[in-house]
């Protein structure tokens, strides 16, 4: 959060340069995106299990919450910073690593956020950005790779249906 806010002017300029959003709106998006990082990092402190009374007085049920594993995140071009932080921050907060597939139109915001994550000391392999022109191939890989346990996607209904089919195959 702090590094995003310290670098908000540069992040906004990157966002404006890559997709044409007016600078004032880009600054607003950076601040909005940073709020997800702040909120989910604070919520991470409250991710713990539950102890539930059992069916007998001397029994109890213990619920343990564990990270699901690798999360594949596919984001749209129109809110490149906010959609990334909205998807990546909760996954990281609960201990999952992320493979982010930003859109081909706006990859620079993703790379800038990955750079800041690295600068913050995030270990290699935790927040990963994959780029390329074969969008359907990369989506299919995220959906079919056994290491990826969850997909988060924002985009068109048509692509959402394709991803849903690929995930269920």
Where are these regions (language model features)?
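Glycine-rich loop-to-alpha-helix module at the N-terminal edge of alpha/beta enzyme cores
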Residues: 1-48, 58
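A broad detector of the eukaryotic-type serine/threonine protein kinase catalytic domain
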Residues: 16-24, 76, 96, 135, ...
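Anion (oxyanion) recognition and catalysis
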Residues: 5, 92, 168
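Residue-level signal for inorganic ion chemistry
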Residues: 15, 37, 95, 127, ...
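Short alpha-helical
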Residues: 10, 21, 32, 79, ...
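Conserved NAD(P)+-binding/catalytic subdomain of aldehyde/semialdehyde dehydrogenases
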Residues: 70, 103, 119-169
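Conserved small-residue-rich beta-alpha loop and adjacent elements
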Residues: 50-124
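Hydrophobic packing residues within well-ordered alpha-helices of enzyme cores
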Residues: 37, 110-113, 142, 163
